[in-house]
Amino acid sequence: MLTAHKIKIIQSLDKKKYRQKYNLFLVESNKIIKEIEKSNYKIQEIFTNDLTLFNYKGVEVSAVSDVELKKISFLQHPKDSVALCEIKNSEIIDTDIQIVLDGIQDPGNLGTIIRLADWFGIKQIICSDDTVDVYNPKVIQATMGSFLRVNVVYTNIHDYLDTYPHAII
């Protein structure tokens, strides 16, 4: 159920501080929400204007009006559903090909890079600590679901590259 308190929490998730505090982020659009079920992300709750779309075991699905959806959406023209998801702990995986990013500040650019990495089959992106947060709503939207398939890890990239065992191009 969508309470005033929950609306306030969801609206606060546009800021990294609150995403970290609540360990939650927002995903918008039915297509991406349906993909989450096949990933290692956990959906806490789905808010939708069509209850017939989602029947996930252990996930609360709440009906909302278009007015309520507009309140909790970060989009100017909200889609039909919003999912509240838990942030997962990302750990570095051993993979030959990966992208290392330093200081990317534009959420749309990071989202596009993640989407391209997914398209090329790159499973991991290492980001410097000052790179925009992968769970920023604009990044999530720009990835078009690719954040589900690409592991994004934040670390000190100088230390990481000093100990990286594979060839660096």
Residue ranges and their predicted role:
Residues 1-50, 131-132:
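Boundary-proximal intrinsically disordered activation/regulatory segments immediately upstream
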Residues 21-24, 42-45, 59, 123-125, ...:
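Short active-site oxyanion
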Residues 26, 63-64, 127:
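General beta-strand structural signal in soluble alpha/beta enzymes
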Residues 38, 94-169:
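RNA substrate-binding interface of SAM-dependent RNA methyltransferases
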Residues 50-94, 137-169:
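S-adenosyl-L-methionine/SAH cofactor-binding core of RNA-modifying enzymes
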